[in-house]
Amino acid sequence: MQAATVVINRRALRHNLQRLRELAPASKMVAVVKANAYGHGLLETARTLPDADAFGVARLEEALRLRAGGITKPVLLLEGFFDARDLPTISAQHFHTAVHNEEQLAALEEASLDEPVTVWMKLDTGMHRLGVRPEQAEAFYHRLTQCKNVRQPVNIVSHFARADEPKCGATEKQLAIFNTFCEGKPGQRSIAASGGILLWPQSHFDWVRPGIILYGVSPLEDRSTGADFGCQPVMSLTSSLIAVREHKVGEPVGYGGTWISERDTRLGVVAMGYGDGYPRAAPSGTPVLVNGREVPIVGRVAMDMICVDLGPQAQDKAGDPVILWGEGLPVERIAEMTKVSAYELIARLTSRVAMKYVD
């Protein structure tokens, strides 16, 4: 009998990279594998994508794991370095790094390195999180061009705040700021992540940085799924029934008795709960697949179990397979039901969930 298991489909992952190349044919791909590749496994994901042009991570530790695992492609530190003492390692490992503040720039100017570092100057075009403000950007850029520890030319990167809202006007403003600053500068350019790739072809430039869409999940909050853009779900969260019980009309289920059956039915108990990372907020009616058939969760999600209404005539039995999201049940639907973003759902599964990779 199978307990909570994440099944990662390598074929779907490779398909998605190819599909994104079709959407941005003139751009190189930074496959973003931060946060354990959005819950898909850092090394296994990188090894599945030998055709990616580079990999993007959030922490130096993630980059070092890639190198230790045999990944030789360029690795971009999307948030830059947090400590000047890391610069010799970044140089020796040929990592690319974002540079987004005065402290990082000063550290580069003062460092003693054997080789210069490939730098992506981060321009704050409107996210207002990391990056150099436009009014300070020319002076900052000039210092980078004069720094002996920076490999020339300097590349330029930014990030959209509302790429998933095509009618709000914010992305056009960010693009205008980015284009104005980049004009006449020789370095590579990148501003498009998943939403930019899908909705803003004018933003693709030299490099794009697919994150969640690489894993077959839509970044948009418009009820779309990855399949609407030709991508396939890479992750399936699976488990099995551990019990099937007769349940009488009028009987409650689970903590607090929040769901009461309106008919005689058969109740399935699934080995899955918030201890595995499944959202405790999932309301009654949230769908799961049992033997490929959609049935609703009933009652509260517990730490280790959820209950589902199999129906009065159900023939399901203990040990039968359950899919919580993935193939046949997009995680975007679960996100909509639970009000928990798909990003969080796929990235927050706990260590007791087994990982299985298939082709």
Swiss-Prot record:
Q: Could you give a single Gene Ontology term from the biological process aspect?
A: D-alanine biosynthetic process
Protein role:
Catalyzes the interconversion of L-alanine and D-alanine. May also act on other amino acids.
Q: Which GO terms describe its molecular function?
A: alanine racemase activity; pyridoxal phosphate binding
PTM-bearing positions, type N6-(pyridoxal phosphate)lysine: 34
Annotated pathway, please?
Answer: Amino-acid biosynthesis; D-alanine biosynthesis; D-alanine from L-alanine: step 1/1
- The protein's name is Alanine racemase
Q: Which family does it belong to?
A: Belongs to the alanine racemase family.
Q: Which UniProt keywords apply?
A: Isomerase, Pyridoxal phosphate
Q: Which cofactor does it need?
A: pyridoxal 5'-phosphate
CC terms in the record's Gene Ontology section: cytosol
Gene name of this polypeptide = alr
Reaction catalyzed = L-alanine = D-alanine
Q: Which SMART domains match?
A: Ala_racemase_C (SM01005)
Instruction: Provide the binding site for substrate.
Output: 129, 303
User: Looking at the Swiss-Prot or TrEMBL record, what is one Pfam family this protein matches?
Assistant: Ala_racemase_C
Q: Which residues form the active site?
A: 34, 255
Q: EC number(s) per UniProt?
A: 5.1.1.1
Q: Which PANTHER family match?
A: ALANINE RACEMASE, ALANINE RACEMASE, BIOSYNTHETIC
